[in-house]
Amino acid sequence: MQDEHKQGNRNLPEIHYASRDWTSKHPGRHNGETHLKTRDLVIQLRGLRIRKWHSCLFPWGTRLTDRCTLQMECEPDGAGVRPVAGDVAGPEESLQLREADLKEIRHPKLHTTGRSLCSERDAQRCHLRRQSV
């Protein structure tokens, strides 16, 4: 991965994430378990000026695979969206991307904003917009 990074692979995703403190319950596939934090992800392909935000609720120590994505925001030129700096939490090896995730980034719906991917999202947080960092 380091060699790919040095060679400037245009399809190499850059992933940034941070945590924010709050507690919530999500009744979907998580069986009503309490989630202590949310993790914000920015996924960007170097060859495209596209960044996607994912706000995911899940307990610490679990992997992204098979978890609900509660909210997604996309801006085709990356304007107003930048990597989250500071307050980085969690081991990087705990973050996994499925091939389906990468295909969705490579072939995005450029003008979709605030599209929900989880039908059982937290109703109190479904319309929250991202704060500037």
Curated annotation (Swiss-Prot):
The reported result of mutating residue 102 to F is: In strain: Isolate NVI-013
Q: What is the effect of changing residue 100 to V?
A: In strain: Isolate Sp103
Biased-composition ranges, Basic and acidic residues, are: 17-35
InterPro entries per the record? Birna_VP5 (IPR004284)
Q: Where is this region: Disordered?
A: 1-35
Q: Report which superkingdom the organism of origin falls in.
A: Viruses
The similarity annotation says: Belongs to the avibirnavirus/aquabirnavirus VP5 protein family.
Q: Which additional comment does the entry carry? A: The sequence shown is that of Isolate NVI-020. The highly pathogenic isolates NVI-013, NVI-015, NVI-023 and Sp122 have a truncated VP5 protein.
Protein name (database record): Protein VP5
Q: In which organism is this protein found?
A: Infectious pancreatic necrosis virus (strain Sp) (IPNV)
